């Protein structure tokens, strides 16, 4: 046995060099060997979840330089951090260690096989290896719905959430083939025991039927894209020379301390944020008195949710301040609003994105189309009139109609946004003429274009045809065949926007029946809504989504099942209300988030119940509009 840090390029610590001389002698001997076979189960770790963990990944200068020159350099993704995951480092290290000949056999996280961020890694694999054999064991616990059922158990048990694959990589200098990919996956719905039995039965890749995979030009091995998508105008214009529809866009806001700065109760946001800002400034004083940064952070860990941006501010000894003016409404999850302390300058909003230009403060009037981001497993979009959280949708990216913050750069204290028509447009100069060119002589405004985009993004034809593209890149918008079709999408987009932005103003669904379990004036306070129960297909209890147990007083019946068809961010809109409209306590901070407080701010104790009934209406009306959208026919200019 040899003790070593494999990735450290054989540079041992003082402990190894002074106490384990014999160990180092064996290591030196190993390093002189011509290694041709490497087998292992590398760990999966991309980094700490919070700066409070104080547990950052090690950095390996030489190995990470090789990663940067290969997998990172070849990727088209802007999210390069995931390429420094330990198991991906292991692939890079092993690929170099065997030189120009050998075999690697790894049991690893299977995420790299189809993730958008690993496209460069896959390209390098096909260039460096003659043959690649993949035995996919599924088990991805991060999926939902039917796909989650298909993935079923993980071969490593319930403690692992990542999909697993056995991968063999072969370098053979005598072979004329390069990048041949052979693939086999276990069946759907298999338990852990059934997957292990399948492995035992197959015994070897020599006896296992394999499909040949041919990569596409994007480096995709699975879920390959429709290349006609590239003919359409892209929505995003950053980091590309292509002309785009929007001149600016933003990720949803990433606070890295949601429990502290989001809450149903405005006063709770004030109290918790003040407490944290005061503690941070006290921590600065401790730093000035001689304590090191790590010790200071640990001392104030109960009062400050540390993030890398706030740690950087601490190290630079820059104090923070607090102002109630920075509190505004935010869409935390679909159809679920919260009070947010948004401060892009103080470090207490970890990744503020471009929101100071889109929604500079609570008075700013604007609209933004939110879209699932790159790497999302299922496409969704939703229009908002407030700042959304990063997890509002999956990896939320937002495209604004206007940019009110652009007209007042450097003038925060005198903001006067006026009417939306007076604000700088969010569209590029090329966007409107591009679409007008398809329908000469026909009137099209920027407002038309904005709602047209929203209508197109709801087209079931569009989502199905370009599903693989939408998992791996942000949307592109086609021009439809006729002006009449264009205007049909505009009108649908307007109606959808009215429902989704003004969901609190729609009429509550009137077709339900209320049952009261107690005598007297009912209470509308909510603790945690839950669906009723029925006997499922297998005999076990299943959710009855025609019945809602609102609280101990009220049960709602006759909820139309069709309302469940409207799915946004992998759940029905109603499921989001049931999950989020509750009383919760953050374990780390002890902060209570009571949705009844939000109801009080809205002036109605029954706000949570009315919200549920309104989202029934929103769901039914949305699906009615979506199902009547025109068939997606592409204009000749985009073919």
Feature-to-residue mapping (PLM):
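Sequence-level detector for compositionally biased, low-complexity segments
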Residues: 52, 74-77, 96-639
């Amino acid at each position: 046995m040899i003790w070593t840090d494999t990735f450290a390029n054989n540079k041992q610590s003082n402990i190894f060099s002074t106490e384990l001389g014999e160990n180092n002698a064996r290591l030196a001997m190993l390093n002189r060997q011509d290694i041709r076979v490497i087998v292992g189960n590398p760990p999966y770790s991309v980094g700490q979840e919070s700066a409070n963990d104080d547990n950052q990944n090690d950095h390996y200068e030489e190995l990470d330089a090789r990663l940067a020159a290969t997998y990172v350099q070849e990727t088209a993704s802007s999210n390069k951090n995931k390429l420094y995951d330990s198991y991906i480092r292991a692939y890079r290290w092993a690929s170099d260690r065997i030189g120009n000949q050998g075999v690697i056999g790894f049991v690893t996280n299977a995420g790299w096989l189809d993730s958008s961020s690993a496209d460069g890694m896959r390209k390098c694999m096909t260039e460096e290896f003659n043959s690649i054999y993949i035995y996919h064991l599924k088990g991805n616990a991060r999926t939902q719905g039917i796909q989650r059922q298909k993935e079923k158990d993980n071969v490593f048990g319930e403690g692992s959430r990542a999909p697993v694959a056995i991968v063999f990589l072969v370098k053979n200098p005598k072979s004329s083939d390069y990048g041949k990919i052979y693939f086999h996956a276990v069946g759907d719905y298999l338990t852990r025991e059934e997957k292990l039995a399948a492995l035992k039965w197959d015994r070897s890749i020599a006896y296992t039927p394999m499909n040949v995979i041919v990569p596409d030009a994007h480096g995709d091995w699975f879920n390959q894209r429709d290349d006609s998508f590239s003919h359409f105008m892209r929505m995003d214009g950053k980091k590309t020379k292509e002309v785009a529809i929007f001149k600016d866009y933003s990720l949803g806001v990433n606070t890295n301390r949601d429990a502290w700065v989001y809450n149903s109760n405005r006063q709770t946001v004030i109290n918790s944020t003040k407490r944290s800002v005061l503690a941070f400034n006290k921590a600065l004083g401790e730093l000035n008195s001689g304590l090191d940064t790590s010790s200071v952070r640990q001392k104030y860990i109960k009062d400050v949710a540390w993030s890398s941006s706030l740690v950087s501010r601490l190290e630079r000894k820059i104090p923070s301040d607090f102002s109630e003016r920075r509190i505004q409404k935010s869409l935390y999850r679909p159809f679920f609003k919260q009070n947010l302390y948004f401060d892009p300058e103080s470090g207490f909003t970890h990744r503020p994105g471009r929101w100071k230009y889109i929604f500079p403060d609570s008075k700013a009037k604007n609209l933004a189309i939110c879209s699932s981001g790159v790497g999302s497993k299922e496409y969704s979009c939703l229009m908002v009139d407030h700042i959304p959280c990063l997890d509002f949708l999956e990896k939320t990216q937002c495209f604004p109609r206007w940019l009110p913050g652009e007209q007042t750069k450097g003038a925060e204290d005198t903001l006067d946004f006026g009417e939306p028509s007076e604000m700088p447009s969010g569209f590029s100069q090329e966007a409107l003429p591009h679409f007008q060119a398809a329908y000469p002589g026909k009137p099209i405004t920027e407002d038309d274009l904005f709602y047209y985009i929203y209508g197109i993004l709801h087209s079931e034809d569009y989502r199905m045809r370009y599903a693989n593209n939408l998992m791996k890149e942000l949307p592109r918008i086609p021009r439809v065949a006729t002006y009449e079709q264009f205007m049909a999408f505009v009108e649908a987009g307007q109606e959808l926007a009215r429902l989704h932005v003004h969901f609190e103003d729609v009429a509550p669904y009137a077709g339900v029946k209320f049952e009261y379990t107690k005598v007297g004036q009912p209470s509308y306070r909510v603790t945690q809504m839950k669906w009723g129960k029925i006997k499922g297909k297998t005999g076990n209890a299943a959710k009855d989504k025609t019945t809602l147990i609102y609280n101990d007083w009220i049960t709602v019946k006759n909820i139309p099942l069709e309302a469940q068809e409207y799915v946004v961010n992998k759940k029905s809109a109603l499921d989001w209300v049931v999950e989020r409209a509750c009383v919760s306590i953050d374990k780390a901070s002890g902060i209570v988030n009571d949705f009844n407080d939000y109801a009080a701010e809205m002036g109605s104790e029954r706000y949570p119940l009315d919200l549920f009934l309104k989202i029934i209406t929103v769901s039914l009306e949305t699906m009615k509009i979506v199902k009547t959208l025109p068939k997606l026919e592409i204009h000749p200019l985009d073919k």
